[in-house]
C-alpha cells in the first residue's frame, strides 16, 4: 500500500490509476481530497516498492512539483470503508524522540541503486580520490537508517523558574566585566545544570549558556552537554537557541564532546539542512574534520534530491563543498550524487543553484562531460522545462569540453525515429523556442546547421506544425516560410527583393505623391487610377533587354504619355519630384508618376534600375529665409517646407550641411 501526497488540486482517481497501473495490478484507490493525497493498494508488495522507487519525488504531473510516495501499511482497525484508519506511518520503528528506523527508506534504496554510478563518476574526476573511502561512506549512509521525521520541541517550560530575567542579566554582566573568576562561573553553571537545556532557547538565557561553554572547564562543559545534547537539534532551529547551539559546537574540544554532538545530531541532519537556522548548526560540525564530520556528507548523498531542492539545503551543500575541512573523497561523493540527480535538480531553482556552482566554480575535471552523459537520457524532460533548458543550453555552448556539446546535439537531433526532437517540438511552451535558440547561437558550427535544419523540417512536417506565433520563428529559420513584404498602402505593389534600397525609396516617394495629390492639390481629372509604381517583373533578369512594358517605370517610350500642347520641362537631368510639384504643368501631366517627365530613357539592350532623383542644395536654417536654390534648372521656383508631409523631414538638415535627397 502506498500513500501519495502533494498531488495537484482536482486530481481524479482515474489519473492515479493510469499512473500507478504501469507498475503492477492496482487493487484499490482512495482519494483524500482535503489533503490532496491518495492511497494506492497493490496486489503485491513488490509492485508497490517498484512504484515507490520510480515515482517518489518525481514531477509526474505537468506544471506541478514532485509528488511524495511512501510505503504504508493498514492499521489494526482497518476496514474497507474506514479511510481515516486505513493508513499508518510507513513500516518502521518509531521512538519517543521522533527518530524512525526505516531500513527500506527511499533515500537508502536510491543510494544503493546508484552506488556503482557514483563510484564511476568519482573515478572519472581524474583526481587523487580514494575510491575505497568513497565506497565506505556510501555503505555507512545506507546502514545508518535512523532518520528523524520531525524535530520535537525542547523540554517543557518549568513551572517554577529559579533564574529570572534580572538575575540572568546580572550574571551575564558580571561575566563580561570579569567580575567572576572561572571557579565562580563553574559554581553558577553547576547550580543551573537542571535548567541549562531550557535556558539555551531563552532570550537572555542563551547568552548566559554561551558564556558558560566559553569559560568553563571541559568536565563542566561535558556535564552541561549531556543534558543539552538530546535537545540540541530543537535548540538549533530556535531563533534564540541557534546561537547557543552554534557556540556549543564551536567550542567543543574533546572527543567525548564531539561524539555526543554527532550522536544526537545525526538523525536530524537532513531536517537541519531544511531549516533557516538549523543549516548553520549543521555546518558548524565541519570543524570536527574527517572522519567525525563525514555524517554531514553521507546525509547529503542519501537525500541529495530533497536537500538540493530546498532553499537553505542547497546553499548549505554549496557551503560544505567549499569548506576547507572537506576532503576530496567527501566532495566527490556529494558532487557525484548531484550529477546523478541533475535531471531532477535542474527543474528547481535551488537545484539549479547547485548545478550552476558545479559548472562555474567547481574544480572537478570532466564535470561538463559527465553532466552531459547523464542529461542526454533526459533531454525530453529537461529541454521542455523553462529552467532546466537553460542548463542544457549552457552545456551546448561550453567551450572547455566540446565532447559535452557534441553528445547533447547528437542525442537531440539524431535520436531514434526523431523521438526526442518530436517530443520537444510538441511542447509549445518551451520546446520550439529552445530549439530556435540552439540553432541560432553563433557557437554552433555552420557545417552542422544544414543537417539540423533538415531534421527540424522533417519533424515539423510530421507533427503538422502551423506557422503561428509558436512555430513561426523556427520555421522561418529553417526555411519553411519566408517573410512576405506587404505594401503599406493599398494599390501600391511591393517592390521585389532584388530591388536595391534606393529603388525602394523611390517607390515609396512616388507612391505617396500619387495617393496624396488629391488632398494636397485638389481633385485632378487627368490623374490615372492605375498603380503609380508597378513592381519589377520577376521573369526578367537584371542586365537583359526586354520589350517595352506599358506603365512600367523601368522601360517605356518617352513619347507614350506626353500630351500635345503640354509645356515642355527641361529634363536633361532627372527632376526631383519635390521641385516638380511647383512646375507649370497642365492637369494631364501634373505629377503623374507614369509620365516620362519623371523617367530616364533606357538604352536598347540594357535594363537598368532607376536612379533616385537628387539635387544639391545649400540649406539655410533661418526662420523665414529661403531654403536654397536648385542647381538643376533656373526655371524651377524655390521650395519651402511643408509642401509635402512625406518629404518635409528631409528639408531640415543641420545648419551648413549639404543635403543630397
Swiss-Prot record:
Q: Name one GO biological process term.
A: nuclear-transcribed mRNA catabolic process, deadenylation-dependent decay
PTM-bearing positions, type Phosphothreonine? 104
Q: Which molecular function term from Gene Ontology is one that the record holds?
A: mRNA 3'-UTR AU-rich region binding
Q: Which residues carry this modification: Phosphoserine?
A: 102, 105, 482, 486, 488, 490
Using the record's annotation, list all stretches that form the RRM domain: 1-74
Query: Where located?
Result: Cytoplasm
Assigned GO CC terms: cytoplasm; cytoplasmic stress granule; P-body
* SMART domains found in the cross-reference section: Pumilio, RRM
Pumilio repeat ranges? 191-226, 227-263, 264-302, 374-410
Q: Where is the PUM-HD domain?
A: 129-482
Q: Which InterPro entries match?
A: ARM-like, ARM-type_fold, Npl3_RRM1, Nucleotide-bd_a/b_plait_sf, PUM-HD, Pumilio_domain_protein, Pumilio_RNA-bd_rpt, RBD_domain_sf
* Domain of life according to the entry: Eukaryota
Keywords from UniProt, A to Z, are:
Cytoplasm, Phosphoprotein, Repeat, RNA-binding
PANTHER family named among the record's database cross-references: PROTEIN JSN1-RELATED (PTHR47093:SF1)
Q: State the protein's name.
A: Pumilio domain-containing protein C56F2.08c
Say which species the protein is native to: Schizosaccharomyces pombe (strain 972 / ATCC 24843) (Fission yeast)
Amino acid at each position: 500500500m502506498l500513500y501519495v501526497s502533494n498531488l495537484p488540486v482536482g486530481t481524479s482517481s482515474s489519473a492515479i490509476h493510469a499512473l500507478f497501473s504501469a507498475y503492477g495490478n492496482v487493487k484499490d484507490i482512495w482519494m483524500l481530497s482535503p489533503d490532496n493525497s491518495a492511497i494506492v493498494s497493490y496486489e503485491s508488495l513488490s509492485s508497490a516498492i517498484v512504484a515507490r522507487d520510480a515515482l517518489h519525488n518525481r514531477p509526474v504531473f505537468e506544471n506541478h512539483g514532485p509528488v511524495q510516495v511512501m510505503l504504508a501499511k493498514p492499521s489494526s482497525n482497518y476496514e474497507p470503508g474506514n479511510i481515516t484508519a486505513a493508513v499508518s506511518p510507513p513500516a518502521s520503528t518509531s521512538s519517543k524522540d521522533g527518530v524512525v528506523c526505516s531500513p527500506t527508506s527511499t533515500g537508502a534504496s536510491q543510494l544503493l541503486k546508484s552506488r556503482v554510478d557514483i563510484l564511476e563518476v568519482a573515478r572519472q574526476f581524474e583526481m587523487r580520490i580514494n575510491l575505497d573511502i568513497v565506497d565506505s561512506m556510501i555503505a555507512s549512509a545506507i546502514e545508518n537508517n535512523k532518520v528523524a521525521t520531525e524535530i520535537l520541541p525542547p523540554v517543557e517550560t518549568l513551572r517554577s523558574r529559579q533564574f529570572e530575567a534580572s538575575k540572568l542579566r546580572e550574571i551575564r554582566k558580571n561575566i563580561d566585566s570579569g567580575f567572576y573568576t572561572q571557579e565562580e562561573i563553574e559554581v553558577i553553571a553547576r547550580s543551573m545544570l537542571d535548567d541549562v537545556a531550557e535556558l539555551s532557547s531563552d532570550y537572555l538565557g542563551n547568552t548566559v549558556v554561551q558564556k558558560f561553554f566559553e569559560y568553563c572547564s571541559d568536565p563542566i562543559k561535558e556535564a552541561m552537554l549531556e543534558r543539552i545534547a538530546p535537545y540540541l537539534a530543537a535548540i538549533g532551529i530556535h531563533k534564540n537557541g541557534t546561537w547557543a547551539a552554534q557556540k556549543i559546537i564551536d567550542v567543543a574540544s574533546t572527543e567525548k564532546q564531539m561524539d555526543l554532538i554527532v550522536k544526537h545530531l545525526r538523525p536530524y541532519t537532513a531536517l537541519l539542512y531544511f531549516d533557516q537556522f538549523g543549516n548553520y548548526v549543521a555546518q558548524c560540525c565541519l570543524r570536527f574534520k574527517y572522519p567525525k564530520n563525514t555524517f554531514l556528507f553521507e546525509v547529503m548523498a542519501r537525500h541529495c534530491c530533497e536537500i538540493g531542492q530546498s532553499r537553505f539545503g542547497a546553499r548549505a551543500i554549496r557551503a560544505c563543498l567549499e569548506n576547507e575541512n572537506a576532503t576530496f573523497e567527501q566532495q566527490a561523493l556529494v558532487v557525484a550524487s548531484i550529477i546523478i540527480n541533475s535531471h531532477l535538480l535542474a527543474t528547481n531553482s535551488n537545484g539549479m543553484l547547485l548545478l550552476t556552482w558545479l559548472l562555474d566554480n567547481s574544480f572537478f575535471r570532466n564535470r561538463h562531460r559527465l553532466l552531459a552523459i547523464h542529461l542526454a537520457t533526459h533531454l525530453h524532460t529537461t529541454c521542455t522545462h523553462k529552467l532546466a533548458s537553460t542548463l542544457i543550453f549552457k552545456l551546448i555552448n561550453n567551450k572547455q569540453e566540446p565532447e559535452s556539446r557534441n553528445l547533447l546535439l547528437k542525442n537531440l537531433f539524431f535520436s531514434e525515429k526523431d523521438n526526442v526532437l518530436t517530443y520537444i517540438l510538441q511542447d509549445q511552451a518551451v520546446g520550439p523556442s529552445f530549439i530556435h535558440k540552439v540553432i541560432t547561437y553563433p557557437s554552433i558550427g555552420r557545417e552542422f546547421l544544414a543537417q539540423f535544419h533538415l531534421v527540424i523540417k522533417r519533424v515539423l512536417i510530421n507533427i503538422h506544425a502551423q506557422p503561428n506565433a509558436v512555430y513561426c520563428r523556427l520555421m522561418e529559420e529553417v526555411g519553411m516560410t519566408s517573410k512576405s513584404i506587404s505594401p503599406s498602402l493599398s494599390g501600391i505593389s511591393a517592390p521585389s527583393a532584388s530591388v536595391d534600397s534606393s529603388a525602394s525609396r523611390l517607390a515609396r516617394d512616388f507612391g505617396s505623391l500619387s495617393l496624396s495629390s488629391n488632398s494636397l492639390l485638389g481633385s485632378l481629372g487627368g490623374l490615372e487610377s492605375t498603380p503609380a509604381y508597378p513592381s519589377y517583373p520577376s521573369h526578367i533578369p537584371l542586365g537583359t533587354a526586354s520589350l517595352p512594358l506599358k506603365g512600367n517605370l523601368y522601360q517605356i517610350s518617352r513619347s507614350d504619355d506626353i500630351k500635345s500642347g503640354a509645356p515642355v520641362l527641361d529634363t536633361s537631368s532627372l527632376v526631383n519630384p519635390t521641385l516638380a510639384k511647383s512646375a507649370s504643368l497642365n492637369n494631364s501631366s501634373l505629377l503623374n508618376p507614369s509620365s516620362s517627365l519623371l523617367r530616364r530613357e533606357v538604352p536598347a539592350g540594357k535594363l537598368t534600375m532607376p536612379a533616385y532623383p537628387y539635387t544639391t542644395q545649400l540649406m539655410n536654417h533661418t526662420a523665414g529665409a529661403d531654403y536654397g536654390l536648385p542647381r538643376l534648372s533656373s526655371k524651377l521656383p524655390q521650395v519651402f517646407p511643408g509642401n509635402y508631409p512625406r518629404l518635409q523631414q528631409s528639408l531640415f538638415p543641420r545648419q551648413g550641411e549639404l543635403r543630397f535627397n
